[in-house]
């Protein structure tokens, strides 16, 4: 019995290996993506590359077409992308896992892997808005917390 306790104590003293995959919270996602370019492949084979501008714009292409009125924001444990004007908008939210330098984006709704990506520092692919006005209607990754007063909306705060 004493030998078993000594072995157990010795095993507990061993360093715990790091987890292979870390699930990122919204703040960690923001720190990784903001001001950087996220590029990768969807599980269906399509390629994407988007510069995550600190003002909330997602510049580049989402695999199928150049982005226009594409925006990004973080939530408690997700990154969400909004593509197109309000009248014809698509929204995609993902949880993000990090395995060394590979980011795994899972659909927030069903947890299926949507894409694998890497993050490049800055905007090395020179993604831009091509001189077009961009409309993110307050969907800004660094938007302030919701006010306690119901008189001031998030949209009005983001417009400041």
Residue positions per predicted region:
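Bacterial N-terminal signal peptides
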Residues: 4-13
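Lipid interaction determinants
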Residues: 16-69, 81-160
């Amino acid at each position: 019995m004493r030998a078993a306790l000594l072995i157990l104590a010795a095993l507990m003293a061993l360093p715990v290996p790091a987890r292979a995959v870390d699930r990122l919270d919204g703040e960690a996602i923001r720190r990784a993506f903001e001001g950087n370019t996220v590029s990768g492949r969807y599980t269906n084979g399509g390629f994407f590359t988007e510069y995550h501008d600190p003002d909330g714009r997602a510049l580049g292409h989402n695999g199928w077409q150049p982005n226009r009125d594409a925006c990004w924001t973080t939530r408690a444990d997700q990154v969400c992308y909004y593509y197109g004007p309000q009248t014809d908008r698509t929204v995609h939210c993902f949880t993000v896992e990090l395995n060394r330098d590979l980011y795994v984006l899972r659909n927030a709704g069903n947890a299926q892997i949507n894409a694998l990506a890497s993050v490049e520092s800055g905007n090395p692919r020179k993604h831009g808005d091509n001189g077009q006005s961009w409309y993110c209607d307050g969907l800004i990754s660094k938007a302030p917390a919701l006010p306690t007063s119901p008189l001031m909306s998030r949209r009005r705060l983001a417009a400041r």
